[in-house]
Amino acid sequence: MPETSAAVRGGADLVLELPLPWAISSAEGFARGGVSILAATGVVDTLVFGSECGNIDTLSRIAEIFYTEPEPYVESLRCNLKKGMSFPIARTWALLQYAPSLSDDKDVLSSPNNILGIEYLKALMSRNSKIVPFTTTRVGADYHDKRLGTNQCSAIAIRQSVAAGHDLTYLASQMPENAYEILRTSLKEQKPLFADDFSAALQYKLLTEYFEGYDKYQDISSDLSDRIRNTLPSFTGLSSFCDLLKSKDMTYTRISRCLFHILLNMTKKEFETCKAEYYISYARVLGFCKDAAPLLTEIKKNSSIPLITSLADARQTLPADALRMLNQDILRNQIYLGHLALKNKKEMVNEYRTPIVIV
């Protein structure tokens, strides 16, 4: 688990897994899942997140409007959508129409980390949580900046460079030393996976369920299901299929997320069950720093959900619903690991035998 290793070696005391339904969800689902885990541990009193804005008061004011949904704001949003605006643009204009004093901050909703930060704040509000939020200002390249050679280039730029097979030595000055060494070592050991590596599996899934449609899956409406079916004959790969399906009201990212919901069998029913369990029913430890071992002890004392340090032991300790959710996550992780093994012509890693990262 190179990501976990990079986090712990980079200074994280503890890394917990965000279950896959929320890890590949919208910003709202991602934030709700993350905040739910933190709240359930019983030991977290502060949440710090990065943002382009860097102003917690501005983000909190916007989050409160989005969370409470006052009628004038909702009516403006409804009217803007009827005019044919995409949802992000319609929401921004509705916000400014409701709160003109935010006009100087109209660009806040065009930045991904701001949007996620607002969702963290909404998640805290929804729980009436005592966790205190803070934000730090993002530095370096913008989230969507694909240029290399800038000071602290974006993750997108790094991923594209890896995909293109470029020499990565120049990244040493733009990444934390530990993270760079882990990336370099990992790439020497195996080829990484990209979205298009799942094209064949997705095409098979779409074909086998062609006649029944896809609207049982999370985030997929009957209209999108019909569009997928009608466009399926033009399928040549996952990425290009996203390009064919995207529209003014559905971004490439959202389409990609929907297709992975289909591939990984993530249904609306499953998401509703997760919500009924208040989003999270267990906390799985992926890695921790030796010096932070007392933190695990405190979580075990105070947590409202089981803390998993051994998958083998989880079968005896988890309630039936939680165990079912964990098993689904493991299966989906194995799908990823299986594709990784095929690409590298290696034996598939067994997640049950993968040790926790301890540094």
Which ranges hold each PLM region?
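N-terminal catalytic cores of NTP/NDP-binding nucleotidyl/phosphoryl-transfer enzymes
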Residues: M1-E3, R9
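Short glycine-biased active-site loop of nucleotidyltransferases that positions the nucleotide triphosphate
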Residues: V8-R9, R147
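Active-site cores that bind ATP or allylic diphosphates and position pyrophosphate for catalysis
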Residues: L18-V359
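Receiver (REC) domain switch/active-site residues of two-component response regulators
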Residues: D13
